[in-house]
Regions:
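Amide-forming acyltransferase catalytic core, primarily the GNAT-like/NAT-type
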Residues: 134-241, 245, 257-261, 274, ...
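Conserved acetyl-CoA binding element of GNAT-fold acetyltransferases
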Residues: 75-87, 222-232
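Conserved acetyl-CoA pyrophosphate-binding loop and the N-cap/start of the following alpha-helix
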Residues: 89-101, 233-242
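Conserved GNAT acetyl-CoA-binding A-motif
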Residues: 106-118, 247-258
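Short amphipathic alpha-helix that is part of the acyltransferase structural core
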Residues: 1-65, 72-79, 145-184, 219-223
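Active-site/acyl-donor-binding loops of N-acyltransferases
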Residues: 128-147, 226-236, 240-358
Length: 358
């Protein structure tokens, strides 16, 4: 695809390192250690779309692959990251072109939805994205919980990865409809990622048997727990565990923790924006204990194949959908919906567990 004298294309994997200079320019706050990790271990697995002018990369968009649970099924989806445009090429529609190209390919693969963590939601709303997950946050002062009942803590090593993967899957599937599959490969990479951010993955345990985990970074000597998962019923022993592990820290910031640990100072903020990619595949992937019937029309400028009027039914066994013929539209008068509205209606925020660690 070409725009003026610029070309839009997906890079061959051997070319991915060509985007590093733009990455370092657009994301100057990322440490050298993290950028090294990203290009050594992550970028090779990504799909990278770029706008080129001759040999110069003007803009880029990365698709990070994840296996994602959705109502009992597992789907290969993509997390949109590292969207950036060189300063002199901004406000020329390059990001829209990259989104359109990447969404088209995801549509061809029948991916139900995609997601991203926006720097500014206003950038993505015009393209069918809407907030569909949130994250809680509170500050913990470790010394206030010294002497409280506490889970054991120990630094996760590669030998702990199989147990972590099994425990995380067991805990998350009981509560959430949507979450990234916690495989051994997922945790192996997470160990490296946290090391690149001067942090760790910490196992929460009872008599050395894993009962959960926490993920934290400590860049600039500021501790931030980015995700905390623990077996139901053991939440009250988490604060004591934090007091032991972070004994010398005056305070720590905690994100993405169980609701039972929320207090009057807890803040909840929108986190991830999602977008339906293949509308029919999305509806067919859903399940609902209470049957849901829908009759609606959608206009999708980015993926015109989704545009139309539909009738859908979602049951405990899955979803069924069909596109209405013109004569049916006049009779049934389908409700006009935005893509983001439909996504939010069918996947409530509390059913989704997608954090920065994904």
């Amino acid at each position: 695809m070409a725009v003026d004298n610029k070309r839009i294309r997906k890079l061959d994997r051997r070319e991915h390192d060509r985007t590093r200079e733009l990455y370092e320019t657009v994301f100057p706050k990322d440490s050298q250690l993290f950028v090294d990790y990203y290009y050594d271990q992550v970028a090779d697995e990504n799909e990278i779309y770029v706008v080129e002018k001759e040999e110069e990369i003007c803009a880029m968009l990365h698709l990070n692959p994840y296996e994602v649970h959705l109502d009992g099924g597992v789907y290969p989806l993509h997390y949109i990251v590292a969207v950036g445009t060189r300063q002199e090429y901004r406000h020329q529609g390059m990001m829209k072109s990259l989104l359109k190209a990447s969404l088209h390919e995801m549509y061809e693969r029948k991916e139900p939805f995609t997601f991203l963590m926006p720097a500014d939601e206003a950038i993505y709303r015009p393209f069918g994205f809407g907030y569909f997950s949130e994250q809680n946050f509170r500050t913990v002062v470790p010394k206030e919980y010294r002497g409280c009942p506490a889970l054991e803590c120990f630094r996760a090593e590669m030998a702990d990865v199989p147990d972590l993967a099994w425990e995380a899957e067991r805990i998350l599937k009981e509560k959430y409809r949507v979450y990234a599959r916690r495989t051994e490969g997922y945790f192996a990479r997470l160990l490296d990622e946290q090391e690149a951010q001067r942090g760790e993955v910490v196992v929460l345990a009872k008599e050395r048997a894993p009962k959960g985990y926490l993920v934290y970074s400590a860049e600039d000597a500021r501790v931030e727990i980015r995700e905390l998962v623990v077996e139901p019923g053991l939440e009250e022993e988490v604060l004591g565990a934090l007091s032991d592990w972070f004994f010398y820290d005056e305070q720590i910031k905690v994100y993405g923790f169980p609701e039972k640990l929320e207090n009057e100072d807890t803040v909840k903020k929108p986190l991830m924006m999602g977008r339906i990619v293949h509308l029919e595949a999305f509806l067919e992937s859903l399940k609902s204990e209470i049957p849901i019937k829908l009759c609606f029309s959608i206009t999708d400028e980015m993926i015109p194949e989704n545009t139309g009027s539909y009738e859908a039914e979602i049951t405990p066994f899955g979803g069924k959908v069909r596109q209405l013929e013109e004569k049916e539209v006049q009779k049934k008068k389908p409700e006009k919906l935005e893509l983001a509205e439909l996504l939010g209606r069918l996947l409530p925020k509390e059913s989704i567990f997608l954090h920065e660690t994904v």
